[in-house]
A protein has these predicted regions:
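Conserved Class I S-adenosyl-L-methionine
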Residues: 167-233
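Conserved SAM-binding loop of SAM-dependent methyltransferases across substrates and taxa
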Residues: 47-57
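Conserved SAM-binding loop
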Residues: 74-75
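Conserved SAM/SAH-binding beta-strand->alpha-helix loop
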Residues: 67-69
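Conserved class I S-adenosyl-L-methionine
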Residues: 1-34
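Conserved beta-strand signature within the Rossmann-like core of class I S-adenosyl-L-methionine
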Residues: 123-136
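A short, conserved alpha-helix within the catalytic core of class I
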Residues: 109-121
């Protein structure tokens, strides 16, 4: 299901991106798996935080997403960096002129869908970044999340594919300007329909602009699959 990119949601995410250093830290985890001088596709890039963070580690990044709003936001933030190409549309219908050296699917799409696209568009490494937890973090109830690490491993084993795997955790909490902002945030992201926002989860924020903070330590799993090995399977 395509994410609904509202101005309010994008504003919250930009605040988190600016304060947490999540995407630069994630890019450092991904970098050792990239071929030298790689052309990398960030599939389902959203606001492009990871796309921009990957630029120091490769020759070029192509950021692809279906939604227009986050891509326009990315273009405004990134300017005219010649190392970055932004493309709007269905990744399945946007093959590159020359196959990518690596493709990153970060919390986006199922394994079989990602591998189908990668077989057609990539000649090197497919990197799947998956949640390593079962329930949605910003909901008051227990709401399952999709595309988990366990599900992805099961699929790769079923397909008979070899892969490299790395588990780690990164902080990606939400800085908040006021308690009213916190209430708005929970109304936007609480998928359990809880009536009362769990304000007790807030801690002191990083500074005067953001006096409140909602911690969120994300357990993640990186799964790396090589296209040549897929062709032999």
């Amino acid at each position: 299901m395509m994410q609904a990119w509202t101005p309010e949601g994008m504003a919250f995410l930009q605040d988190a991106m600016a304060c947490c250093g999540y995407y630069p830290a994630l890019a450092r985890r991904i970098a050792p798996y990239l071929p030298k001088q790689a052309h990398v596709c960030d599939a389902g890039c959203g606001l492009g935080g990871l796309s921009v963070a990957l630029l120091p580690y490769c020759r070029h990044v192509t950021a692809v997403d279906r939604a227009a709003a986050p891509l326009e936001n990315l273009r405004q933030r990134a300017g005219h960096d010649p190392r970055l190409t932004v493309r709007q549309g269905d990744i399945r219908c946007l093959p590159p002129e020359t196959p990518y050296d690596a493709m990153v699917f970060c919390l986006f799409g199922g394994v079989e869908e990602a591998l189908t696209v990668a077989r057609q568009q990539c000649r090197g490494t497919v990197l799947l970044i998956r949640r390593d937890y079962a329930y949605h973090r910003f909901s008051t109830g227990r709401v399952p999340v999709g595309f988990t690490a366990a599900d992805s491993e099961d699929t790769l084993r079923h397909l008979g594919l070899s892969y490299r795997m790395e588990r780690f955790s990164l902080e990606f909490g939400q800085p908040l300007r006021s308690l009213e902002d916190a209430r708005r945030f929970f109304r936007l992201y609480d998928r359990s329909g809880g009536a009362d926002p769990p304000l007790h989860r807030l801690t002191a924020g990083p500074g005067p602009e953001f006096p409140y903070y909602l911690p969120n330590r994300k357990e993640l799993c990186l799964l790396a699959v090589e296209i040549p090995a897929m062709e032999e399977a």
